[in-house]
Amino acid sequence: MKKNISRNPLWPDWYHGKKIDEVQFGRAFLEQWPLKCINGTLYTLDGPVEDESEIKQRILENIEEYVTSGLSKKVTNILETIKLLAFSDPFPIEQDCVHLQNGVYHLPDGSFQESRLFCQNRLPVKYDPKAPSPERWLTFLHELLDDADIPTLQEYLGYCLIPSTKGQKMMLIVGKGGEGKSRIGLVLKRLMGDAASNGSVQKVENNRFARADLERRLLMIDDDMDMNALPKTNYIKTIVTAEAKLDLERKGVQSYQRDIYARFLCFGNGALTSLYDHSDGFFRRQLILTTKDKPADRTDDPFLVEKMCAELEGILLWCLEGLHRLVQNDFRFTVSERAAANVDTIKRSSNNVIDFMESEGYFRFKADYSISSKEFYDIYKLWCEDNACHSVSAIRFSAELRQNDRRYNLETTNNIYLPGGRRVRGFVGIEPLVHPCP
């Protein structure tokens, strides 16, 4: 015969003398600490919970005097129950507002709402329209970049505050080393909190699990970009211009579809290049800013980041100003002549076929002339030898010409005839001026 346990009036409602009612505990817990659970991730009013240990600790503090064994397992079970009770549909992707520590900034009219709502990302900085201008930050940027490139950076950092890929760009800041360019990334981590993560562009492209780390992020910072050329670029290009859900993988978990809106901000001593992709699509996705040389007599300030982070509220206003300008310009970035030339220079350095096609003395464009693919490739190899360049393969050389035939007014043909009646491939519109020895 079961012995009835008299209820102690001091016991919480979810404890019945021998066991804890997990559902009742979960409801009481959510009343005290509101949470939502989306796709297995818990959210507080501050945004996604990156580490559940704090929540587990709160559960432990509530139940430890009522559990005599299996405490760890009980805490885990209750946490899973809370996730079920806190289930919520995904938050809408809000591209017209920025959730901040003290409220919501509305982009269309620049108004501010002093209320904290559940959201996908909340930046750990307060909105203060009267915050002073971030003079130390601005001085640092003027010492680091050409003045014409600062508006581009301002617009891009503002762009990273909202979950949008409409700008369809990634940013690279390139220097010789020691200029302090990576300080920008450290300040952004303080400005954006967990909405920004550190990572590697190479890893995102080459490691199938790394792309899942971009979920829920506004920005990924690569503060020391690997200079090795990418063997492929399809994932990077897709993420930069993402307009639909992407397939993500985590170890031991079935792949799933999610919206990814993370932007890339990369710092390095050289630009991002590809072994095989030399298309306009790869290069037009890049904004490349080059730094000024480090003054020989400059003494580095070890407290520079702390000084700039003291201006976070002013830096936020500066970024919002850039975001407004970008939106008003239909997400077309301000690009200086220098920045545009940077992209062209990198494109040429990774594809010397462009320089060859603009060379003199080896061939000329003439509508009523034609040349076989092999003869034209031999002329190109001669140009490479004369200019101490590595030649690309014959297949890639012909492919580059076919992709740019309109640019050079060429016509691809299969009707080039050699002595003996042999018919080969070639191009109409080229007159050879040199004839390399076979």
Residues covered by each model-derived region:
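Feature primarily recognizes SF3-like P-loop helicase cores of small DNA viruses
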Residues: 1-38, 64-438
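Modules that initiate DNA replication and primer synthesis
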Residues: 1-3, 38-66
